[in-house]
């Protein structure tokens, strides 16, 4: 099936599943829960069913394993969610998509170029475990490949990827995580592939290590420190002598 058809179906799925969320920009609230966000597109039977709170994912339904996956295991102890509910919503989305496809004018969707940023989770210390985060925004349609490279070689160990998060403009964003141990010998890239890009985009990251001081710089710093110390000694000595002289003059007996 050509790419344009896949894009048509992606846009129809998005319109069908999210049209009921309209008008949210007019509502002000301290907290926002998005329950049962369902996205389905074809070909490939691609879909997801998620629960979000204040933009953070609480859980999603694994469509292949047919089970609920909680972002934090502790949440599963507080409540339960039967994955069958999510699977039913996906089936409904697929059915609606097929109907809308037959009634559509087959206008191709527009591929948006996603934007990627790479940053560490914590301040970087060489030899200390850390996590790299690749944040990819402005994704549409929600089909994307995110790959980690270390020294230009693909990395699969320690990689975790979130589901798609829906933005207010109905584009999507996604995060990919890589656990690693920073080393001054390693460089990393987050590789992003999407229909909106003419070629894959690589977002580069490497630890910023302060350059060592040269011998000349060390000599200059030591000389400046020594000079400041000598000036301090001289100035201090002058003040002490002046103080002694002033004290001697005040103690000299005056005329009777």
UniProtKB/Swiss-Prot annotation:
Membrane topology label: Single-pass type I membrane protein
Pfam annotation, one family: C1-set
Residues on Extracellular side: 24-218
Any one GO molecular-function label of the UniProt entry: peptide antigen binding
Signal peptide bounds: 1-23
Alpha-1: annotated span: 24-111
UniProt cross-references to InterPro entries, sorted A to Z: Ig-like_dom, Ig-like_dom_sf, Ig-like_fold, Ig/MHC_CS, Ig_C1-set, MHC/Immunoglobulin, MHC_I/II-like_Ag-recog, MHC_II_a/b_N
Annotated spans, Alpha-2: 112-205
Transmembrane segments: 219-241
Cytoplasmic side, ranges: 242-256
Segments of this protein annotated with the region Connecting peptide: 206-218
PROSITE patterns: IG_LIKE, IG_MHC
Main location: membrane
Glycosylation sites: 105, 145
All residue ranges annotated as the Ig-like C1-type domain in the record: 114-206
Keywords recorded for this protein, A-Z: Adaptive immunity, Disulfide bond, Glycoprotein, Immunity, Membrane, MHC II, Signal, Transmembrane, Transmembrane helix
Biological process (GO), any one: adaptive immune response
Compartments it resides in: Membrane
SMART domains: IGc1, MHC_II_alpha
Disulphide bridges: 134-190
Domain of life: Eukaryota
Family statement drawn from the similarity comment of this UniProt entry: Belongs to the MHC class II family.
PANTHER family named among the record's database cross-references: HLA CLASS II HISTOCOMPATIBILITY ANTIGEN, DQ ALPHA 1 CHAIN (PTHR19944:SF59), MHC CLASS II-RELATED (PTHR19944)
Protein name: H-2 class II histocompatibility antigen, A-K alpha chain
Organism (species): Mus musculus (Mouse)
């Amino acid at each position: 099936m050509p790419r344009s058809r896949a894009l048509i179906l992606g846009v129809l799925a998005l319109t069908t599943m999210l049209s009921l969320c309209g008008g949210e920009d007019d509502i002000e609230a301290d907290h926002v829960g998005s329950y049962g966000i369902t996205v389905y597109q074809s070909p490939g039977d691609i879909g997801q069913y998620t629960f979000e709170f204040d933009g953070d994912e609480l859980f999603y339904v694994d469509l292949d394993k047919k089970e609920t996956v909680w972002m934090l295991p502790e949440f599963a102890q507080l409540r339960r969610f039967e994955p069958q509910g999510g699977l039913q919503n996906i089936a409904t989305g697929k059915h609606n998509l097929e109907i809308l496809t037959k009634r559509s004018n087959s206008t191709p969707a527009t591929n948006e170029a996603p934007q990627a940023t790479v940053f560490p989770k914590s301040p970087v210390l060489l030899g200390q475990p850390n996590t790299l985060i690749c944040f990819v925004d402005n994704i549409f349609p929600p089909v994307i490949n995110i790959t980690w490279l270390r020294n230009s070689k693909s990395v699969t160990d320690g990689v975790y990827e979130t589901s798609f998060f829906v933005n207010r403009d109905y584009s999507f964003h996604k995060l990919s995580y890589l656990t690693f141990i920073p080393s001054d010998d390693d460089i990393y890239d987050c590789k992003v592939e999407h229909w909106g890009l003419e070629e894959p985009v690589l977002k580069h990251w490497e630890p910023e290590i302060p350059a060592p001081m040269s011998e000349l710089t060390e000599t200059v710093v030591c000389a400046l420190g020594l000079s400041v110390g000598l000036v301090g000694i001289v100035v201090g000595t002058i003040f002490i002598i002046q103080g002694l002289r002033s004290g001697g003059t005040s103690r000299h007996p005056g005329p009777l």
